Amino acid sequence: MNPNQKIITIGSICMVVGIISLILQIGNIISIWISHSIQTGSQNHTGICNQSIITYKNSTWVNQTYVNISNTNVVAGQDTTSVILTGNSSLCPIRGWAIYSKDNGIRIGSKGDVFVIREPFISCSHLECRTFFLTQGALLNDKHSNGTVKDRSPYRALMSCPVGEAPSPYNSRFESVAWSASACHDGMGWLTIGISGPDNEAVAVLKYNGIITETIKSWRKKILRTQESECACVNGSCFTIMTDGPSDGLASYKIFKIEKGKVTKSIELNAPNSHYEECSCYPDTGKVMCVCRDNWHGSNRPWVSFDQNLDYQIGYICSGVFGDNPRPKDGTGSCGPVYVDGANGVKGFSYRYGNGVWIGRTKSTSSRHGFEMIWDPNGWTETDSKFSVRQDVVAMTDWSGYSGSFVQHPELTGLDCMRPCFWVELIRGQPKEKTIWTSGSSISFCGVNSDTVDWSWPDGAELPFTIDK
C-alpha cells in the first residue's frame, strides 16, 4: 500500500468513527428528551405509591412526617383531610391493657443525642399519636444536664416526637417555651398550651397549628400551672384545666373552653375543700372527665366532670383502693378527701365505667416505684377495697413517676368507641440516684377487650453515666 492509499484509508476510518460518534450523540439527545417528556407527563397523574424521596444533609419535614434513614428522608404521602373529632363516643369495653410504646430514652441517651426531659405525655390526632415532653434545653451525658432536677427554668420547652421514639434533636418538633404544658388535636389542628415566666407572673401561651392565638396570665400570682397531659376535644372545642395558688392548700382552679386557639369561655370551680392539680382529662359521650392530683390533703383522687357549656360536677373517687402516692394501705375509702397520708402526691389518672373504675397507681405506697392497673367494679361510688383485676406493668423494684390518660378517637382507630390509653413516666437520676441530672423515659398502654399479660417494662438504664463520674 503506497502512502496515498494509507492516507485515504486512515481518513476513511476516521470519518466512519466520527459518523458513528455523531449518531450516538443524536441518539443520546433523543433518549434524554423522551425521558424528560415521560417524567413531565407523569407529574399530572397520581402514582399508585404516591411517595417522594428527598435527600438533604439535614432532616426535612413534609406534612410533618418523616423517617430518617442516614441522610435520606423517605416521606410517605399522608391524608391531610381535616375532620372534627366529635368526642361523642363512649369508652370502649376493655378487659386489660396492651403495651403500646416504649421509648428507652435513657438507655439510648448514654451514647446517643437524647434530650433531658420530664413530664412526657401522649396525644393523638385522627392521623397519628405523638409524645410531648418538657425538655431542659440539654442532652443526656452532657455538662448542661447538671442541675436539671429543677422544675421551672427559662431553658425548658415543650417539644414532640413520634410516639415510641427516643426524644432527640433529630426527630423532635419545637412546640412552645414552657415549664408546664398541655396539647391536643381537634381534628383540624394542634392546640398547644405552654406556661413560662417567673413564679408570680407566669403566662400561658396558646398556639393553634404553631401560631400564637391567645395568652392567659397568672391570676393568683402563685405558679400558674396546667395538666402535663393532653387536653380534651369535643365537637371542635378543646378543654383544659389550670391551677393557680398554693400546692399545699386551697388554690384557684379554672376550666377553659378553647376554639382554634382562642378562649371562648372559662369558669372558676367552686371547690372549697378540694385540690386540683395536673388533671388527666378525656372525652366521654360528649362530656369531659378529669381525674386529678390532690397535693393538699387527699390520698384518693379528685375528679371534675363537665359538659360543653362548662356545667360541672365535682367529687373524689370513693374506692378504698387509693390512687395517689403517698397513700395508706387500701381500706375504707371516701367520696371526699381521704386525709390519711394525704399531703403531697403524684400526677395520675383513672377511667370511669359507670359505677366501676380503672385505677392506675404506683405499686409502692410511699415512693414512685412500680405501676399497676386495678379494676374496681364499684369503686366510683362505693368505699370498699374489693377489686377484681390487677395488672402489673412496672415491678415494685423499678422506678416509675407521673402517669396520665390519653384516648384514641374512632376517627383514628376505625372503632365505634373511644379507646382508653395511658402512659407512665419512668424517672431516673436525681434526687434518688447518684447523677447530676434528672430525666425520664416512658411507656404506654391501650385498653383492649382481649388477652393481656402481667410483666415489668422498666426504664432499664445502667447508671451512673460518664458525665456523673
UniProtKB/Swiss-Prot annotation:
GO terms for biological process: carbohydrate metabolic process; viral budding from plasma membrane. Glycans are attached at residues 44, 50, 58, 63, 68, 88, 146, 235. It is a single-pass type II membrane protein. Residues 11-33 are annotated as: Involved in apical transport and lipid raft association. GO terms for molecular function: exo-alpha-sialidase activity; metal ion binding. It catalyses: Hydrolysis of alpha-(2->3)-, alpha-(2->6)-, alpha-(2->8)- glycosidic linkages of terminal sialic acid residues in oligosaccharides, glycoproteins, glycolipids, colominic acid and synthetic substrates. It holds the Pfam family Neur. Residues 91-469 are annotated as: Head of neuraminidase. The keyword Chloroplast does not apply. N-glycosylated. CDD domains: Influenza_NA. Residues 36-90 are annotated as: Hypervariable stalk region. It comes from the Viruses. Residues 28-469 are virion surface. It is found in: Virion membrane; Host apical cell membrane. The active site is at 151 (proton donor/acceptor), 402 (nucleophile). Gene3D superfamilies: 2.120.10.10. Its main location: virion. Its EC number is 3.2.1.18. The chain crosses the membrane at residues 7-27. The influenza A genome consist of 8 RNA segments. Genetic variation of hemagglutinin and/or neuraminidase genes results in the emergence of new influenza strains. The mechanism of variation can be the result of point mutations or the result of genetic reassortment between segments of two different strains. Homotetramer. Belongs to the glycosyl hydrolase 34 family. Intact N-terminus is essential for virion morphogenesis. Possesses two apical sorting signals, one in the ectodomain, which is likely to be a glycan, and the other in the transmembrane domain. The transmembrane domain also plays a role in lipid raft association. This is Neuraminidase.
